Amino acid sequence: MDYTQFLDSNSINWDYTKIMDICKISYILDRFSIKENDKILDVGTGTGMLIPFVHQHNPKGNIKGVDKSINMIEIAKEKFKNVQNIVFQLADVESDDIKGTFDKIILFSVFPLLKHKISTTKKLIENNLSDDGKLLIAHPESTKSLNSYIGTNAPIYTPILLDIYQQRNMFRQAGLYVEEAFENDRIYYIILHK
């Protein structure tokens, strides 16, 4: 079973098995400086669990969620069908072109699952990020905690998350601009820009 099949088969109960830490999410999104009317892309949106938090920061801005799981996208569409400025698209961010330019791009709890982390991040920045936009990679846990979870749940989760300084340096070596990189025992985030 690959990860997309895993997501599709678990989508119906996904929201009930995942706990969102409001304090961590709010802290990370505050650091990201979402502005009123920002156009936002939520990569790996799943069932749209992050959308209410993003929408709270930016109730008038357009939000687009993309995910490669058709079942996850269908659930997200149903959950937000009455909210006019939120749309969803079935897409694999690594292989599909995402239409549009965005002020903010968010990869929340999805980055370790990318097979081509650097090239995908670079593609999103070059093709989809506005000139003064920012891209956020974030996790509501530390590298150690996440990698421990991944290790106990292989083979569904096989990638690992690099130490924040290693990842920052890899981005810099690839010519990407890292504005901020932070990790403690509770959160992990990197903010990049053009």
PLM feature spans:
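Short, glycine-/aromatic-enriched active-site segment of Class I SAM-dependent methyltransferases
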Residues: 141-157
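Class I SAM-dependent methyltransferase SAM/SAH-binding core
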Residues: 47-94
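A short acidic, Gly/Pro-enriched loop at the edge of an enzyme's catalytic core
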Residues: 97-105
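Short alpha-helix
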Residues: 159-174
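Conserved class I S-adenosyl-L-methionine
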Residues: 1-33, 143
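A short glycine-rich, Lys/Arg-flanked "PGG" loop and its adjoining helix->strand segment in the class I
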Residues: 119-131
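Conserved beta-strand signature within the Rossmann-like core of class I S-adenosyl-L-methionine
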Residues: 132-139
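A short SAM/SAH-binding and catalytic strip from SAM-dependent methyltransferases
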Residues: 104-117
